[in-house]
Amino acid sequence: MSWLHPTDKHLLFTKNDKEDPRLGECVQLLPKDDLGNLSNYDYDFAILGYPDDEGIGLNGGRVGAQVAPREIRTPLYKMTPHLHSTTLPKILDLGDLDKEKPLAERHEKGREIIASIAQSGKRWVSFGGGHDYGYCDSTGFAQTFPGEAVVINFDAHMDVRPTDKGLNSGTPFFRLLSEFSGQVDFAEVGIQNQCNSQFHVTWAKSKGAQIFTLDDINSHGLLATLQNYLKDKKSKKIFLSVDIDAFTSNEAPGCSQSWTTGLFTKEFLEALQWILKNHDVRGMGIYEVSPPLDSDKRTSKLAALLSHGFIFGNLNKA
């Protein structure tokens, strides 16, 4: 079987105007069954979709995120390059991970793909799907950079539920911290008081996690919080995990669990650009965008905007 399904070529938007280039013109599509030949492609950024919300359903959430990868690619590939960019990105779209095999096998294959990208020195953006796929991204990253990996999770929820009741969208960082205990720096940012149990917070802290609640962010600012956390991590590699429910429901209504409280786009983009300019950020995953629950495609466009910021923040730095 093929583990990846190629992205629809019709998503590669173009105005057919050399004076108005779009990101869709910067994308190569990985052909089916060519996953083993990634080293043959010339690219700066890989994009991978996880069209799978089984883990959300298993955690009692509202499903719909399985259609997110396509709905995020659509506005992303219509965007223009950044106004301050002097070069165009070379993007390799790997397509979407197959979801016919059992969930655990899908997670392991996703992890294998991410590790392959990370080991090649390339950067990536992934689109969920449930946040259980944060396991694929974070562990594929951590195994590639043992002892120098930093994972920052922007989220309303801890997502450190134990796996004794099975895998689901609440378990990715329980798995990461259990498997890579003492080998990865891990921070949770934007944690909301009404969304988490004290048991989960205590467990994460026992594994070395740094926790910054939404109250902390509101008191000190997102940028200042991240600057302080990263001040002694200049030499390390970073992966950013973004559960879209970290944002307010006004800005990201299309997700399984949204609240009126949360992060704001403006502050996040400011912090993202600072991190990209000052640190080595290898990848970013965006999870739990649920287009059936969205309003005017706001949440899909937010995810696309964050991806655009990641791509050009890295490209302009170079």
Identify the meaning behind each predicted range.
Residues 2-318:
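Conserved alpha-helical scaffold segments that buttress catalytic/binding sites
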